[in-house]
Amino acid sequence: AIDLGTANTLIYVKGVGVVVDEPTLLAVNKSDKSIITIGGEAKKLIGRVPDTIELVRPLRDGVISEIEMAEELVKTLLSRAIGRAYSRPRIVICVPNGVTSVEQRSIETAAHATGASEVFTIEEPMAAAIGSGLNIFEPYGNMIVDIGGGTTEIAVISMGDIVNANSVRVGGEDMTEILIEWLRREHQILVDTGIAENIKHAVGSAYQYDKEPQVTVTGRDIVRGVPKQVLLEASDVRNALEPIVNDIIEAIRISLPQTPPALVSDIDKDGAWLTGGGSLLKQMD
């Protein structure tokens, strides 16, 4: 099974577990579009490449923006995962809700090119529901809030189908970007995405919690160009993340009036199921 996400791509092999967990990123030669490296090796090049090399994210805001690059990424990662150990496997690929038929065929073609005997696609909210252990075939409303790297998808599932779906183009990567901008604006330092992600994981939160920590961050002083350290409070980081969190909450609120009353009653009893990397933000539940 393949989870093709905006930020990361995971491959799971039945009976083995997750065998690939790589950033959805490629380093490409600008002149001939040849691929230099992908995944984690490509991520190491962020901020360190010459003008002749381009870092490409084939998915943007939850949709496939670079079809050929997405196809190459899937093909390469599948070849690594499958190797010679599996002969003509059956593959299930998670795709964003609302993916176009052209995008879907392209990903299926890439999977077939690795020697797959059969290729199936499943929408990400449905896969998240199954992975959460929910009985999706019951006449019962389950709300999935899948906070990915570039998109948050909200879906209400009942009787094996998506009854109502809504999405907002914000996710974990937007949290990282807003922290970079906030540090530049409020503290006059520049940091890369790796440092911003560390801040998010260390002290980021959706709401206040007990014994909130501090974190010291080193970046480049915008004015003098020298290293500069800043001590950050968890409350300040939370305030910086607030616009993204509010966008996600608003998307959930919009989904409820579009849902049949009986299913809303079910959701009121059980709440929503949070999935995706963005759901790991402290106090997100």
Residue ranges and their predicted role:
Residues A1-I147, A155-A272, S279-D285:
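Nucleotide/phosphate-binding catalytic cleft detector across ATP-hydrolyzing
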